[in-house]
Design a protein with these regions (language model features):
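Conserved beta-strand hairpin/beta-sheet module of binuclear metal-dependent hydrolase folds
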Residues: 1-47, 85, 145-147, 193-204, ...
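General small-molecule cofactor/ligand-binding pocket signal
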Residues: 5, 89, 113-118, 132-134, ...
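Active-site-proximal loop/helix segment associated with metal-binding centers of metalloenzymes
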Residues: 15, 129-203, 207-216, 222-224
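Active-site neighborhood of phospho(di)ester-bond hydrolases with catalytic His/Asp-centered motifs
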Residues: 34-37, 54-62, 90-91, 202-207, ...
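Active-site metal-binding motif and surrounding structural segment of the metallo-beta-lactamase
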Residues: 38-89, 111-121
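Metal-dependent catalytic neighborhoods of phosphoester/phosphodiester hydrolases
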Residues: 69-76, 98-101, 270-278
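A gly/proline- and charged-residue-enriched helix-loop-helix capping module
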Residues: 93-105, 114-119
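Binuclear metal-ion centers of metallo-dependent hydrolases, dominated by the metallo-beta-lactamase
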Residues: 120-121, 210-301
């Protein structure tokens, strides 16, 4: 199972009822954070999932409302006695940004493993997390992310016996390893069944809609996307390269995602004024995100 929490749903500046943008994923007991706006460590504390098993932080881009929570988060982790390294991933410019933000927390007790990615589509694996990255159009280099929980095919006893695989190697092959014995090579496909669908969650803020994004989020179990403005402010979002809620809904529909969470709302739109009735006419399974809203996504049989 993959647990998702929308820690903050605000864009530009925080409001009393709305922290700045951040999303937390929990998979096999480990955690991954996307973006770290001001006060992220506070909303994490309110959530109650703890800090200890946070392994990865992914930045979409380096505007202040997505990164200024980093010093507070690092100090919180340090005060909790953390010793394990924290991996931080982001587009070009990561080292410069982290160096600047961490001037006030030089005495943290753990290392930062910085992975500064080239501005191109790519995939990587960090610990429990399979991460896909897509460059998207914003005022500065910006990434959309997809987090996947991969699922091993089922072990098929009859197939292993049919292929005359020694039983002593079944476990190793089930784990994806090849085994060689007396000139014979045994491969995982000799004991495993068909590929099984995993869990896919896509996250995108601060960009204009593009065809590549629709492909990137295809068939996602959950698509979290900015809806900077609920009403028609098209010229405004084009100028600053953001997305309307209606545009996010069209991406969700074209991408055949199961559920859309809107986030990164303009501070001009308080929670009480968010009405997505018209948005749901475009994509019915749309939800207006709220701070610390959670969802558990299980594997399909």
């Amino acid at each position: 199972m993959l647990d998702i929490c929308l820690l903050g749903t605000g864009g530009m500046l925080p409001l009393p009822e709305r922290f700045l943008t951040a999303m937390l994923a929990r998979y096999n007991g480990r955690k991954l954070l996307i973006d770290c706006g001001e006060g992220t460590q506070v909303t994490m504390k309110l959530l109650g999932w703890g800090y200890k098993t946070l392994d990865v932080l992914c930045f979409t881009h380096y505007h202040g409302d997505h990164v200024t929570g980093l010093p507070g988060l690092l100090l919180t982790l340090g005060n909790a006695g953390r010793q394990e390294p924290l991996t931080i991933i982001g587009p070009p410019g990561l080292k410069k940004i982290v160096d600047g933000l961490t001037v006030v927390c030089r005495d943290i007790t753990f290392d930062l493993n910085l992975i500064e990615l080239p501005y191109e589509k790519q995939e990587l694996v960090v610990g429990e997390f399979h991460i896909s990255v897509l460059p998207v159009p914003h005022k500065v280099p910006c990434f959309a992310y997809t987090i996947e929980g991969k699922r091993q095919p089922k072990f098929v006893v009859d197939k292993a016996k049919e292929n005359k695989v020694p039983q002593k190697y079944w476990k190793m092959l089930q784990l994806g390893n090849e085994v060689a014995e007396d000139g014979k090579v045994y491969t995982p496909d000799m004991v495993l069944g068909e590929a099984r669908k995993g869990i896919k969650v896509s996250y995108c803020t601060d960009c204009r809609p593009i065809d590549a994004l629709t492909t990137f989020v295809q068939d996602a179990d959950l698509f979290i996307c900015e809806g900077m403005y609920i009403e028609d402010e098209l010229e405004q979002v084009k100028k600053y390269k953001h997305m309307l809620a209606s545009e996010a809904a069209r991406v969700a529909k074209a991408g055949n995602v199961k559920e859309l969470w809107l986030t990164h709302f303009s501070p001009a739109v308080p929670n009480s004024k968010i009405d997505i009735t018209n948005i749901k006419e475009i994509f019915a399974n749309t939800i207006a995100g709220k701070d610390r809203m959670t969802k558990t996504i299980g594997f399909e049989e």
